[in-house]
Amino acid sequence: MTHICIIFPKCLIFKMRKFYLMKLCFARLLFGLLPFLLAQSLRAQFLQSDSDDRLKQWVEYLASDALEGRLTGSQGEKMAFDFLSEKFQEWTLSPAQGDKFTQAFEFTWEILPSPEATIEWEANGDRTALNAYPISGCGEALMPGTEFLNLGFGIEDTANGHSDYPSVSDLGGKVVLIEAGSPKSDNPHADFSRWTLLERARLAAQRGAGAVLFYGGTSDDSPSKTIDPHIHAMPIPVWYCLDALPQSNEPALIWINSSLNRIKKTGHNVVADLIRNKNLPTLIVGAHYDHLGWGERGSLYRGEKAIHNGADDNASGTALMLELARFLAQTKDKRFLRFNYRFIGFSGEELGLLGSKAFVEGPAFQREGLLTMFNMDMVGRLDLQEKTLQIHGAGTSPRWATLLDSLKPIGLKIKTSESGIGPSDHTSFYLQDLPVLHFFSGTHDDYHKPSDDPHTLNYRGMTDIGNYMLRIIAHVPDVLPFSKTKAPEQGKSKFKVTLGVVPDYGWEKKGMRISGVTEGKPAALAGLQKNDVVLQLGDHPVDDIYGYMAALGKFKKGDQTTVRILREENSLTFKITFE
């Protein structure tokens, strides 16, 4: 074997050593920069600073006085859905159905006494109209010249040692007069607070009363003149008399015309599709655009009547939905081309998730092919110091936890909760077994008040939230398994027991319809299902959501009873054990 000896000049050896040292330094520098480069990738901005300006412009319009609070069914709602439709049209999105982006749904706004409705007192052949009005739970009936019975406070409460029904088994269709206040008791621990007027009227109806007329009590005892459409009407009239009842030594009769008018209104969801390929999964991005109008319902403001502009709740989420729609419609980034998108502006959220509920029950909703639903509700108040974003629904898919944590932006704190059930529109989709995420920047003192105005919002924070959402979309897998979650903790409940169901708050027929059933809870263990209508718990009739809550209050943990439900057209009874 021949050995060859090569001698390098000293200058070449020096250059080779210098090159090696430079390469080693570069490698060490690159390794040291990896965390920084990773951080920079997490700061990747899909939305730029001009997004702040667009978000501000859109919020200032949606939350302007001109739209008068965007109350569902109002002219302000129309101005808002016209605005959303114009934007979707501008970005060449397609209506989900037909040739319009709007999808209408009808709801009961209020119930009013008809012009003929009255209660009259007859004595000595003369009839005098009483200063009275129908209250929540009132049914319709015509009752000419009916005998009446004074039933005290109309309470039967053996635990507190009080009963106004000791010798009355059947009220025989009489008009029952009930004092609106509470009885005095020698027992210092006696509590009659659960005996609302509605509860007393239900008891009287069960005992055979033909009508209930409340009277007296303090000003605090006077019920609202607004008839709650969510309270199912009893089969009997229920009225309240403002003045003292007439006194007569002669026999008297009561005449009742309890005729009511249900005032219907129409709300509108705004639905737009971005279809790339019909075979791709669809990701839903939604936000409710309605608010409280002039504070007719749900306001926490106690001053003079004023417009509730709802900048954070929820012009912020609506504007961010629009910005995501604009970006996704225009992007060429392949990571976003893996999905079809459906953008939905919901109305009726403030009245009980009416719009999202109508949508998932309507023909435009097909569960097959849907990947997930992102909901933005109140995303405009990201705190400048804390920078904490709340994300609800993190337990609705086993993939969410890792994804949300790994993509968390630098400097942004993420607080997650697992439940897919909450007071916003994602709940309607979770109840259809769809993974959901609800993005929420937190509550504040301006919530449901006229002071929730555009100047209070953090528009840079909204853009940051939008970029985080886009990072999630860019990395979300094409297949996303669904997980059921436990109901959220609501703090200490006034009920001793739970059935483990989600009530349908928009149900207007008799009974309490179930929107969802929590696994492992009494209802699920007994065999109850979504869309079952609860009609009776034990001996207690359930006419509506309030009757359901009243019935729950009669039980304690460990009690066994029966629950009677209506499933489609079949009446079924199940045995149940409360926990």
Predicted stretch roles:
Residues L525-I545:
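Conserved PDZ fold ligand-binding element
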Residues A319, R326-F327, D445-Q490:
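His/Asp/Glu-rich mid-to-C-terminal helical/loop segments that flank catalytic regions of hydrolases
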Residues L480-E519, A524, K554, T562-R564, ...:
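PDZ/PDZ-like peptide-tail recognition elements
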Residues A141-L142, V238, F346-S441, N458-R460:
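Metal-dependent peptidase/peptidase-like ectodomains
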